[in-house]
Regions:
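A composition-driven surface/loop motif
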Residues: 1-180
Length: 180
């Protein structure tokens, strides 16, 4: 992975200036491997992150067969693109995307193919996804939801209580909900 978080605690990433991460096969651009929460923030309001996963990896979240969970975005301009089978933000191939929260910032999340924009990778569920602020654009890959489940999987407990949200599923996938 271009950057991988590890350990038992929480990880906070403060965005300053322009940042780009691109990973190779089976890895997320920003790969979350720590047990605690991963928070992406931009207190100075001048930061951006462009994270691109390789084949089977999420843009931000899990690598191949890895879950993308406990991810919070509070600010910044964040663009996340998963590789084929990976979510933009959430699970890698076969990985669930759960406990994902957006409270602010400008977030664009796209899957290469078969993963959700925000939620599960291909064959991964998207659970407990909450958006309460910011501007969020989420586009799922073929057969996957914009926000929710990847290909052949479900989207559950998705809450939108604020912000501006655009969610488009790929071919045969829901905008918000499950994949084909």
């Amino acid at each position: 992975a271009a950057v991988s978080t590890t350990g038992e605690g929480n990880v906070n990433i403060e965005l300053n200036g322009s940042n780009a991460l691109k990973s190779g096969h089976s890895h997320a651009g920003l790969e979350k491997n720590n047990d605690g929460n991963l928070t992406i923030q931009d207190k100075d309001k001048d930061g951006s992150l462009n994270a691109k996963g390789g084949q089977d990896g999420a843009g931000i979240g899990g690598g191949s067969s890895g879950a993308g969970s406990d991810i919070t975005i509070t600010g910044g301009k964040v663009t996340a693109r998963g590789g084929n089978y990976g979510a933009g933000i959430g699970g890698g191939a076969y990985g669930n995307g759960s406990d994902i929260t957006v409270t602010g910032g400008e977030v664009t999340a796209n899957s290469g193919n078969y993963g959700a924009g925000i939620g599960g990778g291909g064959w991964g569920n998207g659970n407990n996804i909450s958006i309460s602020g910011g501007k969020v654009t989420a586009t799922g890959g073929t057969f996957a939801a914009g926000i929710g489940g990847g290909m052949h999987r479900d989207g559950n407990d998705i809450t939108i209580s604020g912000g501006e949200v655009s969610a488009d599923g790929g071919r045969c996938g829901a905008g918000i909900g499950g994949g084909l």
